[in-house]
Design a protein with these regions (language model features):
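Bacterial N-terminal signal peptides that target proteins for export
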Residues: 1-11
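A short, well-structured edge-of-sheet supersecondary motif
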Residues: 27-58
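Mid-domain, small-residue-enriched loop/turn segments at the edges of structured enzyme/sensor domains
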Residues: 42, 115, 136-198
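Active-site SXXK
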Residues: 63-93, 126
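Acidic helix-start/capping segments at beta-turn-to-alpha-helix junctions
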Residues: 87-104, 142-143
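Conserved catalytic neighborhood of penicillin-recognizing serine enzymes
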Residues: 98-136
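Conserved active-site loop region of the serine DD-peptidase/beta-lactamase
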Residues: 153, 188-228
């Protein structure tokens, strides 16, 4: 399916697939260590190629920050599939759902504490623009962040923890480090979504499009990929 072939481009920052794995693990480790040498950063790498996996610094717990919005989107779309809720179904966010001080392109556009829009638009705001109000509402929609955590682990992704929402992290920035994953767990999840029927074709294509539309990723790994 053409849309599935595009996802490998969208998620290449975590899922590095080589057509030919021509370098040894030791060579790759040396190259990575050379790149990060002298940098004040904690860097972890996971590479999957067919049935082989290579990792560097994978034992540490890396804060997911807004990357957890991908995990939330998966849980939301799966719940919508089970309940027969179309992407075009409309919901209304009220004053209790809108934090005017958090990052929210949605609120910036509508300038209202009562916003009516579709599930699809909400997911787009969360995934493509990292909207925190949309994120918090969608977490509540699936029954809380623990349900997102359980959903991901039921997919076979073990080394991950999701216990905070954007709201709780806004209240205490130190909690931003409580949502974590290893590089390999993120990579395994991305490959599972890419190669298995985690989502319906409609929802897979929708999520892929939302990821490709992410404004914050255009100048990162994606910038070095072929246009086609």
């Amino acid at each position: 399916m053409k849309s599935r072939s595009l996802l490998s481009k969208a998620v290449v920052s975590s899922l590095l697939l080589f057509q030919v794995l021509s370098v040894s693990a030791s060579d790759l480790t040396s190259d990575i260590q050379e790149v990060i040498k002298g940098k004040k950063a904690q860097v972890g790498v996971a590479v999957l190629y067919k049935d082989d996996a290579f990792t560097a610094n994978n034992d540490d717990q890396y804060p997911l920050m807004s990357v957890f919005k991908f995990h939330i989107a998966l849980a939301v779309l799966k719940k919508m599939e089970k309940e027969g809720i179309p992407l075009t179904a409309v919901v209304t966010l009220g004053p209790s759902d809108i934090d005017t001080k958090t990052w929210s392109p949605m609120y910036k556009k509508y300038k209202s504490k009562k916003i009516t829009l579709s599930y699809g638009d909400l997911i787009n705001y969360m995934v493509s623009q990292s909207d925190n109000n949309a994120c918090n509402w969608l977490i509540n929609f699936v029954g809380g962040i623990q349900n997102v955590n359980d959903f991901i682990k039921n997919l076979g992704i073990d080394r991950i923890q999701l216990i905070e929402t954007e709201k709780s992290m806004e209240q205490d920035i130190r909690k931003s480090y409580n949502n974590w994953s290893t590089p390999l767990s993120v990579t395994q999840l991305l490959r599972k979504v890419y190669t298995e029927k985690v989502l319906s074709d409609e929802h897979f294509a929708f999520l892929e499009k939302a990821m490709l539309a992410s404004a914050s990723g255009k100048d990162k790994f994606r910038a070095g990929l072929p246009k086609d």
